[in-house]
């Protein structure tokens, strides 16, 4: 690190320290005792989503004068050396390497009091996701939003579309959607829509008309000139696995998921013309791309056919908008989904690291970090052999998976939860965060439980709170709501904010060529060096539960032997900080260090 940067860091630290000592502001003043609130959140602090009675029992109020005096004294008593992360400017690049926030509109924020989240509710909370001001630290810092389906649909989840050109009335109108896009553009947020092309709803006019045609056909042979929509689906008179009987006829139709989701015939040129029009419609409106649902199901058990269709779709979308972003869901192991990169698609969700059985969770729970480090470093070869321009899409959970709060138990649970988040967010590519994961929301079992209302407050009657899916089980949240966590510097929420901020400060994290430093790493310390456009950043993950030391003699970054001056960010789960002295690195349990 050159002298100019070191001087800027020193000046920033001095200024920040003076500001903290002279003011009574700052996160976590009331939690200056160093206790991680998550240690108690699962006991006395654990609350039900409908326990409104508990929420009225707040602490007594004091006068403004008393509060100010106590706050000033508290700030003086708990003033700590400022974190350099707060003083380093962001380097957010307008490309397709982003941090996406997955939003289930139904459960996010209700603007009209009907218990269902809507687009106006999302618009009102955009500043929570990203306020568009790089100088603030009050937002999450995500610069992308993945909208789960918002098209009209008869189901709460809306993965069975009845109109690809409109917005579900429960969510709002096309004008609301256009307002959302404009508000996101002002904040530098790229919006991608869920595009469901494997199937439609059985209530879609295409299927309704095709069904009516077959019911009236009798024993005659179908003619697509009489009913073009017959060719939009797979119909047969022979019963087969994955096919459902069409009531009132002797015909069957393909419906691999369930009878209400008839599979589309993606070989139909007429249907492909419809798909091209649909993509153009939304891209012209300002959508930044699409999340492609169930891409491995397009052609059942045929990777070559799936890749061929994805190639056509990618070319179609890119011809309309060159910088559009496409990410596909191919729920397979790494050797399976990586083959889909041959289509030229930008990204595929990296299922190998996600979920309770994924590599991140296993590593955090005690497996050797060696496999994590070696696998991270090998991804470029694994994916690059199919598409040298690939962009990985790491995620930790999504709407189909149990939420990560349930993965960990015991006294280290909250620390492990945080560590896992960092290991996901510090991977290459476009990282994805499922709404509420930044709060440690619970949700497992049936799908409805995984899509519970965003936990803005303990008070279920608070403005904006959603009711959630009708068939969701009643269960208690494990950790505090946003109301509490936003006031606690050691909360899961604040940890996520800091991790995303570090990611946004160091573009090498998402874009760099990865080298696993096996000679220095060991079972509990994983060291990765990432190089992008001639600049290096070193990431050190310590997955041990207790504080640990590592000899880093010989470790360099940007051509210099590592010293404390090279620290440009760290993630700890409590008050103990990472430090370097005489080539010995000391890191608290479940911590991450960033060097540059």
Describe the residue ranges of each PLM region.
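Acidic/aromatic-lined carbohydrate-recognition and catalytic surfaces
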Residues: 81-273, 284, 291, 295-343
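Conserved alpha/beta catalytic core and glycan-binding cleft of carbohydrate-active enzymes
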Residues: 202-203, 208-209, 213-238, 314-315, ...
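Beta-strand-rich binding/interaction modules
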Residues: 547-572
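C-terminal beta-strand-rich structural cap/linker in extracellular carbohydrate-active enzymes
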Residues: 578-596
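Loop/helix patches that line or flank the sugar-binding groove of alpha-linked glycan CAZymes
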Residues: 395-398, 403, 407-549, 557, ...
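Bacterial lipoprotein signal-peptidase II cleavage site
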Residues: 26-35
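C-terminal motif of bacterial Sec signal peptides marking the signal peptidase cleavage site
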Residues: 22-24
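Bacterial N-terminal signal peptides that target proteins for export
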Residues: 2-14
């Amino acid at each position: 690190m050159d002298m100019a940067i070191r001087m800027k860091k020193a000046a920033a630290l001095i200024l920040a320290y003076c500001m903290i000592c002279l003011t009574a502001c700052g996160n976590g003043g009331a939690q200056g005792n160093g206790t991680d609130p998550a240690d108690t959140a699962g006991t006395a602090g654990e609350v039900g989503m409908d326990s409104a009675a508990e929420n009225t029992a707040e602490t007594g109020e004091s006068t403004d004068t008393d509060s100010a005096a106590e706050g000033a004294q508290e700030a003086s008593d708990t003033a700590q050396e400022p974190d350099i992360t707060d003083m380093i400017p962001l380097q957010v690049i307008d490309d397709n390497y982003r941090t996406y926030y997955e939003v289930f509109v139904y459960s996010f924020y209700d603007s009209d009091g009907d218990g269902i989240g809507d687009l106006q509710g999302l618009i009102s909370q955009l500043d929570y996701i990203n306020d568009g001001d790089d100088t603030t630290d009050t937002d999450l810092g995500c610069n992308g939003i993945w909208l789960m389906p918002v098209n009209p649909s008869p189901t709460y989840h809306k993965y069975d579309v009845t109109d690809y050109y409109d917005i579900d009335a429960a969510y709002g109108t096309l004008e609301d959607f256009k307002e959302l896009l404009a508000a996101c553009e002002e904040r530098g947020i790229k919006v991608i829509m869920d595009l469901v092309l494997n199937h439609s709803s059985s209530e879609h006019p295409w299927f309704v008309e095709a069904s009516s045609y077959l019911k009236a056909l009798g024993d005659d042979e179908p003619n697509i000139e009489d009913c073009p929509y017959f060719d939009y689906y797979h119909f047969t008179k022979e019963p087969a696995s994955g096919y459902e009987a069409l009531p009132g006829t002797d015909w069957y139709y393909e419906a691999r998921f369930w009878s209400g989701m008839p599979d589309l015939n993606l070989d139909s040129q007429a249907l492909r013309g419809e798909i091209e029009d649909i993509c153009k419609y939304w891209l012209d409106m300002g959508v930044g791309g699409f999340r492609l649902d169930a891409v491995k199901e397009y052609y059942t058990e045929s990777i070559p056919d799936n890749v061929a269709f994805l190639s056509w779709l990618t070319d179609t979308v890119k011809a309309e908008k060159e910088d559009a972003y496409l990410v596909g869901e191919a729920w397979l192991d790494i050797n399976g989904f990586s083959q889909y990169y041959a289509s030229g698609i930008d990204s595929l969700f990296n299922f190998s690291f996600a979920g309770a059985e994924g590599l991140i969770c296993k590593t955090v729970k005690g497996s050797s970090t060696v496999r994590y480090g070696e696998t991270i470093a090998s991804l470029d070869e694994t994916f690059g052999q199919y598409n040298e321009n690939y962009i990985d899409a790491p995620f930790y959970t999504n709407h189909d998976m149990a939420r990560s709060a349930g993965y960990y138990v015991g006294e280290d649970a909250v620390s492990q939860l945080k560590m896992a988040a960092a290991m996901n967010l510090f991977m290459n590519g476009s990282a994805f965060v499922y709404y509420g994961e930044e709060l440690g929301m619970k949700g497992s079992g049936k799908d409805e439980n995984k899509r519970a209302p965003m936990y803005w407050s303990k008070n279920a009657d608070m403005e904006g709170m959603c009711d959630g899916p009708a068939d969701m089980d009643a269960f208690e949240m494990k950790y505090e709501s946003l109301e509490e966590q936003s006031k606690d510097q050691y909360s899961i929420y604040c940890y996520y904010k800091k991790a995303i901020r570090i990611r946004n400060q160091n573009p090498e994290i998402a874009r760099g060529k990865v080298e696993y430093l096996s000679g220095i790493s060991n079972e509990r310390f994983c060291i990765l060096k990432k190089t992008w456009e001639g600049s290096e950043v070193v990431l050190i993950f310590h997955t041990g539960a207790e504080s640990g030391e590592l000899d880093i003699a010989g470790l360099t970054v940007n051509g210099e032997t590592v010293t404390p001056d090279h620290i440009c960010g760290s993630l700890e789960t409590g008050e103990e900080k990472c430090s370097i002295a005489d080539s010995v690195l000391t890191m608290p349990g479940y911590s991450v260090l960033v060097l540059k």
